[in-house]
């Protein structure tokens, strides 16, 4: 999500705590997306849809070498629902559904000395994963349920450094950030529910755990952007250390492994002062690749987007479409995603300069 944010329209990155020290005013970024996924297997086909807030960030600076930012961003969204019937040897009907969300709210502060800025981010991460398994025999009026609920939270600390400078013909910036390993605390509940009638229900707890359950892994990120007049090029990548094994009762067991991602994007604006409307648009293209800690396959994606600057303003809006594939041997998934975003830039808290 947000594959072009590293270069597209100069949007700031929540993963880089030092970005606000290089601003020249107040900036608010807002973006959301809608996504449709199609999964294909040799004997089945499924279509799912989802949508969410992608980024909400407010940054400001007084123009004297320091900045402050706050924001909200989703870390992960997942879910599925399956249903099947068996006739032999014992007929029954079963369903299995899983949904999970994880979000992070954060505060950032940054200080700049000449072309170098240092930043710190404090984040609060919370997530909920719920799995519901149901089994119903022909003799049952109501199904039996296996309910699994996992709630996690963590305090996340990130440090970042950002170097930004320019020459007569070029401008460039280089950024690095490191997220520290953090303990994940919360509760895990695994229960069985037997419905004798609409009013008589038996509940049995199979597993309950509370306290420190796992660790949120450390990660490294780096990126570089290069621009000249009407075009801009950006490259970004990240590496995340291996998380712990996913071995809670009620979920599939999975061993964690290290993961990485890389993205490349380019933006071109023919002539910002042209009278023709299409010459004032910002044209974007990008590509993206990612591996996952609990899945063997990789994600390959490409993005196309356009941006438009508001008249007589530094604020911009953009629209992008992304296509991605998860190549696999038995189950293949591909998706379309449409993202819409706005970046408002104003000169609040900055003293006007009179030459």
Enumerate the predicted regions with their spans.
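N-terminal, post-signal peptide beta-strand-biased segments of exported outer-membrane/organellar beta-barrel
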Residues: 1-74
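Outer-membrane beta-barrel porins/channels
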Residues: 61-355
